[in-house]
Amino acid sequence: MRTIDKRIAPNVRLAATLVARAPALTLAYDARCKSRLAATLDTGEDVALVLPRGTVLRDGDVLVADDGALVRVAAAHEAVLLVRAPDALTLTRAAYHLGNRHTPVEVGAGCLKLEYDPALADMLTRLGATVERASAPFQPEAGAYGGGHRHGHDATFAEDYALAQQVFDEHHGHSHSHSHSHSHDHDHDHDHDHDHDHQHGPSCSHGHHHGHR
């Protein structure tokens, strides 16, 4: 059994004829989120998918097997919900409530697409949206920080949040440290001046009272 263990970076340009000749690996979104997977190419060949943890495959990705052969990824048709609305406000509200539930969503022109879920379909209908069940490829938005994780699971959402926090710290950590140091210096100077006046200041009120004792 061949092992597929590499994904060619999207910015690497390959000859179209070379990619077209490569066998396809057709997977639904749930399977494309798995870095370890036993799968079957469209040719009928069984393969083992062993990719870096956290990899999310997208339609059109090109993979490399352990023998150097190319394999192209295709998004399978699956049960989805197509969400439309009579106005932008209703569609925005629908997107907000889906995001609040960490639901993977594919954003189209005037339409949202998500995996079929009857409970979500009912919620969206109550919000005033029009919901249609269909069979189509599903390719949701990637994570804002490149993680691309499946947000429906708390563990992967926590990973995306941790990554977002790391990016924030990298951009703002230095200025925060500088401010902290400044505050520390200020406190030090303040304490020093206070001690100096207490020991030597003839007009210090504490010294004046002490003299009367």
Swiss-Prot record:
Protein name: Urease accessory protein UreE
Function: Involved in urease metallocenter assembly. Binds nickel. Probably functions as a nickel donor during metallocenter assembly.
GO molecular function: nickel cation binding; unfolded protein binding
GO cellular component, as recorded: cytoplasm
Protein family according to the UniProt entry: Belongs to the UreE family.
Keyword annotations of the record: Chaperone, Cytoplasm, Nickel, Nickel insertion
Signal peptide: none
Compositional bias annotation for Basic and acidic residues: 182-200
InterPro entries in alphabetical order: UreE (IPR012406), UreE_C_dom (IPR007864), UreE_N (IPR004029), UreE_N_sf (IPR036118)
Gene Ontology biological process: protein folding; protein-containing complex assembly; urea metabolic process
Cellular compartment(s): Cytoplasm
Region feature Disordered, mapped onto this chain: 170-213
SMART domains: UreE_N (SM00988)
